Amino acid sequence: MVMAQKLKEAEITEQDSLLLTRNLLRIAIFNISYIRGLFPEKYFNDKSVPALDMKIKKLMPMDAESRRLIDWMEKGVYDALQRKYLKTLMFSICETVDGPMIEEYSFSFSYSDSDSQDVMMNINRTGNKKNGGIFNSTADITPNQMRSSACKMVRTLVQLMRTLDKMPDERTIVMKLLYYDDVTPPDYEPPFFRGCTEDEAQYVWTKNPLRMEIGNVNSKHLVLTLKVKSVLDPCEDENDDMQDDGKSIGPDSVHDDQPSDSDSEISQTQENQFIVAPVEKQDDDDGEVDEDDNTQDPAENEQQLARVKDWINSRHLDTLELTDILANFPDISIVLSEEIMDQLVTEGVLSKTGKDMYIKKRDKTPESEFTFVKEEADGQISPGKSVAPEDYLYMKALYHSLPMKYVTITKLHNMLDGEANQTAVRKLMDRMTQEGYVEASSNRRLGKRVIHSSLTEKKLNEVRKVLATDDMDVDVTETINKTNGPDAKVTADVSTCGGIHSIGSDFTRTKGRSGGMQQNGSVLSEQTISKAGNTPISNKAQPAASRESFAVHGGAVKEAETVNCSQASQDRRGRKTSMVREPILQYSKRQKSQAN
């Protein structure tokens, strides 16, 4: 009892956090390799992990391939992890080196600020804590909670893999790394890895994979999150009807992206109730018990409806999907979630745009959606009026898409210079489809066809008036030549270039000074960027600025500021990615000889 109390009160150091995360990665990769049959069974030894109270299969270096995988982990991944460069590790099984993909295990990492010990995460808590915030790791994380979260994640991963179809005999094992670009040196490559081209960084899926969020472990100084994609889902007929955003197979299969206070309340009996499909009752954050799908409790249903409705109203995005509800309310069953969405459609809160896809209804009509466009054109915009970030990003998407014949998510994502991830870009495309600018059907090779009409032309002209040329792609050399002399220096707040800001992501901006630029404008000196810390999340959140916040000296936007913003976009375009130098090629003939 005394030892247990000491363990509970033990201080979690940064080294403890790093070692726990390293061990979790080992356990996950070894379990994946064993259960998915990537190596013969004789390559694994049983190993006990007292800290997690579980037994695992440890991969031994029996041949060149198994040694190579161990080296990737121990010498490559760990090097990037301890330097706090590593953002995402993607452990992939493909048909060939170039694809298509079979399965992908994505491990994401968030690091704490060394001063405040706060782990910055994009938090959408479940339950009634709908506003989210910063998770204070110093106050909330205990060793017991870490152990519970780790067990939960590993057991969920194991149960998922046991439900998947058998891995094909011929496959290729690849590992890729993404980095926090604001702290990672451009020339950095961990051992056994090399820089990969933009084409090599792309991921090709022949069909829509099953996508699941397995869980996360907050070890106070570092947060590890695991997500899985696979085309070997025995329920693929259901997945074929789902959109490319990916779906989970049940509400209990999607765990919180972020740690919640409920992690510390997990009892010993609950610890063994980690399931892949919703077949058992589990307590949620409020101590409520999920009812069986066949049992209807009107009072409970009304309460869940109110929770979901409040959460939807608090969202800054208008579009959402059924999977958003399942991910943020894992205690609500699929059946009840569908009923709630149907009820919200009936009440006029939502409008259905497709299978399991919805958009919040607005009071204004589509024709008045961009009324501020006309007001600005007529000089009626008040100085303090700003454009909402999501509308600003949508206008940029329209600006790039409407002149084209066909548009794809990848093409639009590249044109936006990384200001939105592919999920956000997909939602922008859905919105364009809903508003009649893009056809709903898609050509596999060309993408979705843009509808060219008088309405499209009118919308494009309106968008151009708002964005003007200073907020879009700028010829850097031409802009430099227009500055008020070569020594002109203007301090520019580029923390919200593109109208979007995200904590701990590659959207985050810092203040820069334009004076350090070279004459040709093609290179921005490193001295122009001031960094507040040496971790990916050391820059605290700043309020998002409107277009007017870039105006100086009576509202005239200096061209040098525009160069800074454009240069930041160019930097985002070159997102650093590494892949292993020598992938592991596995063929049936080789595997049979090794198994004998």
From Swiss-Prot:
Domain HORMA per the UniProt entry, residue ranges = 15-228
Entry keyword annotation includes Nucleus: yes
One Pfam entry for this protein is: HORMA
Instruction: Tell me, according to the record, the phenotype of the null mutant.
Output: Failure of the pairing of homologous chromosomes during meiosis (asynapsis or non-homologous synapsis) in both male and female gametophytes.
**Top-level taxon of origin:** Eukaryota
- Can you give the residue ranges of the SWIRM domain? 351-449
User: Where does the record place it?
Assistant: Chromosome; Nucleus
- Check the record and name the PROSITE patterns matching this protein: HORMA, SWIRM
Nucleus: present as a keyword of the record? yes
Biased segments, Acidic residues type: 282-295
Gene Ontology cellular-component terms for this entry are: chromatin; chromosome; condensed nuclear chromosome; nucleoplasm
Region ranges (Disordered): 235-303, 562-596
Please name the GO terms of the biological process aspect recorded for this protein, alphabetically.
Answer: chiasma assembly; homologous chromosome pairing at meiosis; synaptonemal complex assembly
Coarse class of the protein's main subcellular location: nucleus
What are the alphabetically sorted keywords of the record? Chromosome, Meiosis, Nucleus
Tell me, how does this one assemble?
A: Interacts with ASY3.
Q: What does this protein do?
A: Required for normal meiosis in male and female gametophytes. Plays a crucial role in coordinating the activity of DMC1, a key member of the homologous recombination machinery. Acts at the interface between the developing chromosome axes and the recombination machinery to ensure DMC1-mediated interhomolog recombination.
Q: What is this protein called?
A: Meiosis-specific protein ASY1
| Species | Arabidopsis thaliana (Mouse-ear cress)
Traced from the root, the source organism's taxonomic lineage reads: Eukaryota, Viridiplantae, Streptophyta, Embryophyta, Tracheophyta
Designated gene of the protein: ASY1
